[in-house]
Regions:
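Gly/Pro- and small hydrophobic-enriched strand-loop and loop-to-helix capping segments
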Residues: 213-229
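Conserved alpha/beta-domain cores
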Residues: 1-203, 209-211, 225
């Protein structure tokens, strides 16, 4: 068994245990393997171990992998900051984007999404910690942004994403994740019909699952320590 395969098994076991502790079905939770800085060969090894969904932060690096792995039925998620000049590449090559935080970026993605492809699945990135250095829309601005994105053709608004500040304080982690879950619930009370909470990484996935995560973004625990970009 390869290291990546054994790592995937361990992460899946963590997700399943956390889900059971929360009274949830583990099948509700998608493991997104974050492959930024790792080679296409390592993504291929993860696919051989049953992994289909992969997350990337850097467009040029991701495009090379998407081309190299085009023989595999992979689902590609863009999870990094979105530059205006990269929206066409994202819209043309990815299945999901988790990091939409501005209406003009959403418009550019919609304009560039090829008509022959399924709608681009979109999550809004929310700055749940209030840190000026963090990307994301402020919680009070989520609803108008959601309305704008929902109205765009070729995009499908699915939910919310957050990257809270790193912390060993489990209660702080839970508050951040709970805040995102409550925002989603508020949108759904207004009829948005969203089903996705993208939150939780290698160090805090259990807390995220407890608070309702449906996608956990796992890099280090799958591929090992991050290589230099």
């Amino acid at each position: 068994m390869s290291t990546i395969e054994s790592n995937l098994q361990a992460v899946r076991a963590r997700i399943a245990a956390a889900a059971r502790s929360a009274g949830r079905d583990p099948a509700e939770i998608v493991l997104l393997a974050v492959s930024k800085t790792f080679a296409a060969s390592e993504v291929r090894a993860a696919h051989a171990a049953g992994q289909r969904a992969f997350g990337e932060n850097y467009v040029q690096e991701a495009l090379a992998k998407i081309v190299a792995l085009s023989d595999l039925p992979l689902i590609w998620h863009f999870i990094g900051p979105i530059q205006s000049n990269k929206t066409r590449a994202i819209a043309e090559h990815f299945d999901w984007v988790h990091s939409v935080a501005r209406a003009n970026i959403a418009q550019r993605l919609a304009d560039a999404r090829p008509a022959g492809r399924a709608p681009l699945e979109v999550c809004l990135q929310v700055n749940v910690s209030g840190e000026a250095s963090k990307s994301g829309v402020a919680p009070e601005e989520v609803r108008p942004l959601a309305q704008a994105v929902r109205a765009l053709p070729r995009l499908r608004l699915r939910g919310l994403m957050a990257i809270p500040e790193p912390s060993a304080d489990v209660e702080l982690q839970r508050r951040r994740f709970r805040g995102l879950r409550l925002l989603l619930a508020q949108l759904n009370a207004d009829g948005f019909g969203l089903d996705t909470l993208s939150m939780g990484m290698s160090q805090d996935l259990e807390t995220a699952v407890m608070e309702g995560a449906t996608i956990v973004r796992i890099g280090t625990a799958v591929f090992g320590e991050r290589k230099r970009a």
